[in-house]
A protein has these predicted regions:
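Accessory beta-strand-rich segments of carbohydrate-active enzymes
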Residues: 69-70, 129-248, 272, 429-431
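Aromatic-rich peripheral "rim/lid" segments of glycoside hydrolase catalytic domains that contact
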Residues: 668-722
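Conserved small/polar residues in nucleotide/adenosyl-binding loops
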Residues: 1-2, 6-16, 727-733
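Substrate-binding/catalytic cleft of secreted carbohydrate-active enzymes
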Residues: 407-671, 676-684
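Beta-strand-rich binding/interaction modules
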Residues: 263-301, 720-729, 733
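Extended carbohydrate-recognition surfaces in non-catalytic/accessory domains of CAZymes
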Residues: 53-157, 215-228, 232-235, 245, ...
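Active-site-adjacent substrate/metal-binding segments within catalytic domains
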Residues: 117-144, 151-157, 162-168, 246-253, ...
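Short glycine/proline/serine/threonine-rich loop/turn segments at secondary-structure transition edges
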Residues: 151-152, 192-196, 211, 277, ...
C-alpha cells in the first residue's frame, strides 16, 4: 500500500514542493530544486526497493471461525497423495450448504489453532481423552487482497495442518493436502479477487490419532493405513498469501562444508512465464543477522532460465565469518534477488561430523569434540496440543540450556520451525525424526492401494521435513525410525538415498532402538547409517542402544569404581549413543502451570482444567494431612520430587563424561503431559520440574567429579572416593 501510494503521488509531491518553494523563497529556487530532486530520487529508490520484495499477507493474525460439521461423511473417502489435480477431486461443501458456517461453534480464533484447543469437551465429556473430536470441522476467515496484486502469481503458504485439509477460496476448491504437520503451497492465482474481500475456508478432517508416545500403532482411515501422529485436528501452522511476479525464487539451500567458513548455495529460480528468459542477473548478499555488516555481495549472470525450475549453485568462502556453535550461535542472512523478487534465508557457518581419533569415533563441531547431552521430546504442547507458541518454543530451548543440555530430540514426531529458530538463535543442537515412519514388514511388498498410499505418504512427509529444516544450523542428525523391530528393506534403502540426496550435509540413521545391539559386529537393523557427503551405507560404526526404564532414584550400585559403573563403555570404534535412558516419573510444576492458566484467562484447552484440578488435589492434600510444614506450597513439593530425577540424571551424565568414550546420552524424557510421559524432566509448559542447578552442575564445562563407591554406610564402614577433572572442549574459548 505504501509503494502504491508513493508511485501514484510521485508527481504530486514534486509539483507541490515546487509551488511551495517558489512562493516561500524565490531567491533560493536553485537550492530548493536540488533538494526536491534528491527527495524524488529517495522516493524512487524506496519504491524500487519495495518492489524488489515479495508482498505478503499474514492470515494467521486475522480472525477465524471454527464450525463442527458433525454430520459430514468422511469415514470411507478416497485419499490422495501429492501431487493432486484439484479438478479431479470430489468437492465436499459444508453439510446442508455454506450457511452452516454462519453459526460457528467458536469465533475470533487466530492461528495455529485446533478443535481440541477451543472446543475440548464439545460432547460434554472432558475426562482423559473423551473430549477429543474426530471428524470434519471448518476454519474460515475473510481477507482483503490489494488491488495491485492483479497479474501477480499468488500462492497460499500453509505451514501445517492435521490431518487433511480441503481448501476453498470464495467457495471454490483450490487445494488438498493430507501430509500432516508439513508445509505445502497452493497456487490460488485463478481464485483470488484482488481489490476485494475474499473468503478462505479450510475443511479439516481429523480421522484418528494418539495421545501417547507411540508412533508404531496401526491407524486406519477406511481402507488405508495412515501415518501415526498426535490426535489433534486443525490448522496447526501459520498461513500466508504471497504475491510475486512470474519469475521468482522458489528455494534456497545453504550447504555447510567441511571447511566451516565455506558454504555451497543452491538456488532454485522458477520461471512461470511462457518463454525462456535470457541474461538474467542474480544478486547474492551475505550480511550479519543482527547488524548491518555485509560480508559478501556479488552479482552473477544467469544466461538462460528455462520455463519451470532452474537450479544454480554458488560457492562462497568467508574466512572472516564467525562460526555458529552452542556457545556462540552467530547467524547470517543470505539474500538472493532475481528479477523483482528477493528471498532471504537465515543460516550459520558450522560443520558437524564424526572423526576417528586414534581408533575412537567421536563427534566434532567446528573441529572441537562435543559429547551430546540431550533429551527426547514427544512434542505435546499446552492449549492446541500439537504446536508451540513462540513463547513456549523459546522456553523449551532456554530450559534445556539452563539444565546444561546441548541438544534435544524431536522424538517419534516431526519437529517445529519456531523451536528450531530459537535453537539457532540461542545455541542448541537438534536431532529429528519424521515420526510414524513404520509399516508392517509382512505388507511391504503387497503393492496394493494401501501400501502404495503409505509409502508415497511417508516419502512425501520426509521430503517436506528435510526441505523445511535443512538450513537450520542447530539441526545435525536425521533418524528415520524409533525402535523399529524390522531390518531395513529395499524401500528403506531407497528412502535413505532420497533423503541423503536432498541433504547430504547431515548424518542420517535408519533406527534408534532398544534390544540387544551387538557391540562388535555389523548389523543393519541397529547400525545402518549414512555420513555427510558420503553415499556409502555403513552397518558398523554407529552404536545406539536404549535403556528406557529408570531405577526410581540414584543408587549406590550405579558407581562401583573407575572402570565399573552405570553406562560405562570402552567400545571405541563406534559412536556410542545411549539413545534413551533412565525414566523416573515426577509430577509437573502444578503451581506455575496454574498461575499461567489463570493469567491467560482461559481454561478451554485440551488439558488446562485437568491441571487446575490436579493442583487443587495436591494443595488440599498438603493442607489437610499435616504436610504443609515440610512443603508450604505445592511448588515446594513438586520441585523437591523433580530433584530426585535431576540428581539421578546428573550423576549418570557425570558417569558418561568420566568414561570419555560415550559420545551421546539421551534423558528419557523431555516433556510430560497430562496422560503420561511423567518421566519428562520438564512439564508440558516447559517448566523444569526441579531446581535446575541440581542437574546443571554435572553439565558444567569444567568441574571436579567426586565419586564414592558407597554413599550409604554403617558405622565403621569404608568407601573409596575417586576424583576426576572433567573438561568439555566445545565450551567457549
Amino acid at each position: 500500500e505504501i509503494a502504491q501510494c508513493l508511485v501514484g503521488s510521485e508527481m504530486c509531491i514534486r509539483d507541490s514542493l515546487l509551488q511551495y518553494t517558489i512562493k516561500k523563497n524565490r531567491g533560493k529556487m536553485k537550492s530548493a530544486i536540488k533538494k526536491i530532486f534528491v527527495l524524488t530520487g529517495c522516493v524512487l529508490l524506496l519504491v524500487t526497493s519495495m518492489r524488489a520484495q515479495r508482498a505478503c499477507l499474514n492470515l494467521s493474525e486475522t480472525l477465524w471461525n471454527i464450525t463442527l460439521d458433525r454430520s459430514a461423511v468422511w469415514q470411507n473417502d478416497s485419499l490422495y497423495v501429492p501431487p493432486v489435480n484439484i479438478h479431479d477431486l470430489p468437492v465436499h461443501i459444508p453439510t446442508g450448504g455454506w450457511n452452516l458456517l454462519d453459526t460457528p461453534d467458536k469465533i475470533g480464533v487466530t492461528l495455529p489453532a485446533t478443535v481440541e484447543q477451543h472446543l475440548w469437551g464439545w460432547n460434554g465429556e472432558t475426562f482423559g481423552v473423551t473430549g477429543n473430536y474426530v471428524g470434519v470441522s471448518w476454519f474460515d476467515t475473510k481477507i482483503n487482497v490489494p488491488a495491485d496484486w492483479r497479474n501477480k502469481r499468488i500462492v497460499m503458504n500453509v505451514a501445517s495442518v492435521r490431518f487433511r485439509a480441503e481448501i476453498f477460496v470464495n467457495k471454490k476448491l483450490v487445494g488438498y493436502d493430507l501430509v500432516n504437520s508439513t508445509p505445502f503451497a497452493v497456487d490460488v492465482t485463478p481464485f483470488i479477487l484482488p481489490g476485494q474481500e475474499n473468503v478462505i475456508a479450510f475443511r479439516i478432517t481429523d480421522p484418528n490419532g494418539n495421545f501417547n508416545w507411540k508412533d508404531s500403532q496401526v491407524y486406519t482411515w477406511g481402507e488405508y493405513r495412515t501415518n501415526p501422529s498426535h490426535g489433534f485436528g486443525g490448522i496447526t501452522g501459520k498461513v500466508e498469501l504471497v504475491a510475486t511476479d512470474k519469475l521468482y525464487i522458489g528455494d534456497v539451500f545453504i550447504k555447510n562444508q567441511p571447511d566451516p567458513h565455506s558454504i555451497e548455495v543452491e538456488v532454485t529460480a522458477c520461471n512461470e512465464t511462457k518463454n525462456p528468459m535470457k541474461a538474467q542477473k542474480m544478486l547474492l548478499t551475505v550480511k550479519e543477522h543482527k547488524g548491518e555488516k555485509v560480508l559478501y555481495r556479488k552479482e552473477y549472470s544467469v544466461e538462460n532460465l528455462v520455463v519451470g525450475e532452474n537450479k544454480q549453485t554458488f560457492h562462497i568462502h568467508l574466512p572472516v565469518a564467525k562460526l555458529w556453535s552452542t556457545d556462540s550461535p552467530h547467524l547470517y542472512d543470505l539474500s538472493v534477488s532475481v528479477g523483482t523478487d528477493n528471498y532471504t534465508q537465515r543460516f550459520g557457518f558450522r560443520w558437524f561430523e564424526v572423526k576417528d581419533i586414534h581408533g575412537d569415533k567421536q563427534f566434532f563441531l567446528n573441529g572441537k569434540r562435543i559429547v551430546l547431552r540431550t533429551a527426547i521430546s514427544w512434542s505435546f504442547w499446552p492449549d492446541n496440543g500439537i504446536t508451540p507458541s513462540d513463547e513456549l518454543a523459546r522456553r523449551q530451548v532456554e530450559s534445556a540450556k539452563k539444565l546444561g543440555l546441548n541438544m534435544l530430540n524431536f522424538h517419534r514426531t516431526i519437529g517445529h520451525s519456531n523451536v528450531l529458530d530459537y535453537a539457532d538463535e540461542l545455541g542448541l543442537l537438534y536431532f529429528e525424526e519424521p515420526g510414524g515412519n513404520q509399516y508392517p514388514i509382512n505388507h511391504f511388498n503387497d503393492n496394493n492401494k494401501q501400501s502404495k498410499f503409505y509409502f508415497a505418504y511417508r516419502n512425501e512427509k520426509l521430503v517436506r521435513m528435510i526441505k523445511r529444516d535443512r538450513n537450520h544450523p542447530s539441526l545435525v542428525i536425521y533418524n528415520l525410525h524409533n525402535e523399529r523391530g524390522a531390518w531395513p528393506q529395499v524401500q528403506d534403502y531407497a528412502q535413505m538415498r532420497m533423503a541423503h540426496s536432498l541433504d547430504p550435509t547431515r548424518i542420517l540413521t535408519y533406527n534408534s532402538s532398544n534390544g540387544e545391539n551387538p557391540e562388535n559386529e555389523a548389523n543393519a537393523r541397529f547400525k545402518l547409517h549414512l555420513m555427510p557427503n558420503d553415499t556409502t551405507f555403513y552397518d558398523y560404526g554407529w552404536y545406539d542402544r536404549h535403556h528406557a526404564g529408570g531405577p526410581g532414584c540414584y543408587h549406590d550400585n550405579l558407581y562401583w569404581g573407575k572402570d565399573n559403573y552405570h553406562r560405562f563403555s570402552d567400545h571405541k570404534d563406534e559412536i556410542i549413543y545411549w539413545g534413551e535412558d533412565g525414566a523416573i516419573g515426577t509430577p509437573p510444576r502444578l503451581q506455575l502451570i496454574r498461575d499461567e492458566i489463570l493469567q491467560s484467562g482461559t481454561t478451554s484447552g485440551w488439558e488446562a482444567m485437568d491441571y487446575m484440578k490436579w493442583y487443587d488435589a495436591y494443595d488440599s492434600f498438603l493442607k489437610h494431612n499435616g504436610f504443609a510444614k515440610a512443603f508450604p506450597t505445592v511448588d515446594d513439593l513438586t520441585r523437591a520430587m523433580g530433584n530426585v530425577a535431576f540428581y539421578y540424571q546428573g550423576r549418570v551424565i557425570e558417569n558418561i563424561r568420566i568414561s570419555n568414550t560415550v559420545d551421546a546420552y539421551a534423558v528419557n524424557g523431555w516433556e510430560s503431559m497430562k496422560l503420561e510421559n511423567h518421566s519428562g524432566i520438564v512439564d508440558n509448559y516447559r517448566y523444569p520440574k526441579g531446581d535446575v542447578e541440581v542437574m546443571a552442575r554435572y553439565n558444567q564445562p569444567l568441574f571436579l567429579a567426586v565419586k564414592m563407591n558407597r554413599k550409604v554406610l554403617n558405622v565403621g564402614d569404608t568407601t573409596i572416593v575417586d576424583t576426576c577433572l572433567l573438561y568439555t572442549s566445545d565450551a567457549a574459548d
